[in-house]
Structures are given as C-alpha cells and as structure tokens.
Regions:
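Short hydrophobic alpha-helical segments used for membrane anchoring or interfacial signaling
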Residues: 38-41
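Charged, compositionally biased boundary regions
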Residues: 2-33, 46, 51-165
C-alpha cells in the first residue's frame, strides 16, 4: 500500500438511526447548531461538509446558507442526479422540549422546497437534538422525536464503540 492509499471501513446504514450513529465517523467530528451535508456517489458516502446554522429560522437569516449549500451541490453534480442526492443533518442544541416539537422544522421545509426547485434530490433530511432525533421526510414522524437510545443501540454505534471510534 502506498502512502496515498488508505484503508476505508465500510459502514452499512440501514436506518436513519444508523446514519446518525455513523455521522461522527463520516464527518470526523460532532458539532451542535450545525448543518451537515453528506455527499454521495451512488450508495457510497464520499465526504461531509459542515455549516453553522443561522441565528434563527427566518428566511432572511437562512437564504445565504441555502444559496451556499445549493451552489456546492450543483458544483459537485448533485442537481438532477439521483445517485448524487445528499443526506442533510441538522444538529441542534435546541431540544424537542424547548422547541415545542421538532427543532428547525421551518428551515427543513425551506431546504426541501429549495432542493425541489434546484432539482437536487434528498437522500435524508433529519435532525438530532439533545433529547431525540427525527427524519423530516419520514411520514408519521413523532412530533417529539425518536429517543436518542435508538442511535446509541444502533449496530453502527455499537461497532464504533468496539473499534474505539
């Protein structure tokens, strides 16, 4: 193996909880009040990009973020290519309880509308908060989220613990 080659571990995610358990390994770190955009080629995650969340969900606060994300996704060829559809994670310091429901729901809806307009598919759009997680695109998603324990009990999280990741 040359210095430029690396051993990559394949992580198989079968659910959103698995994907959220894998996010720290995919991104290389965790952060709250962030939007993670995970880029894909087919079923393979390629890289992750992190952005600070805006100070509020007001359109005037989030337009610049949406412009930047869409520009990047267009540059990498995600527009019009279902195999390149990204997965987005809103990592929130605001809990479901504090938000009175799903945190950052308005921003998520703006992302969905903008992606439709730009012809960018969505592999996943979800939120992780201190007291739960939810997929915004899951029909019938619980208003107060799924328990964090579902991520912690994910085979992906358990494997990371065993491997010391």
């Amino acid at each position: 193996m040359t210095d430029s080659q690396q051993d990559y571990q394949t992580i198989r995610c079968r659910s959103t909880a698995d994907f959220l358990a894998a996010l720290p390994q995919l991104a290389g770190f965790t952060a709250t009040d962030s939007l993670f955009v995970v880029l894909f080629t087919g079923a393979q995650a390629e890289r992750a990009v992190r952005f600070d969340l805006p100070s509020s969900e007001e359109p005037s606060e989030s337009t610049r973020l949406l412009d930047l994300v869409c520009d990047i996704l267009s540059e990498v060829g995600a527009a019009g290519d279902p195999d390149a559809a990204p997965a987005l994670v809103i990592s929130s310091a605001l809990s479901f309880k504090e938000a009175g429901g799903t945190p950052w729901r308005r921003l998520a809806r703006r992302i969905e509308r903008r992606f439709r307009r730009e012809r960018i598919g969505l592999r996943e759009l979800c939120c992780i908060a201190p007291d739960g997680w939810v997929s915004y695109i899951e029909s019938g998603a619980p208003q107060h989220g799924h328990p964090i324990s579902e991520i912690e009990a994910s085979p992906v999280a358990l494997e990371a613990l065993v491997n010391g990741d």
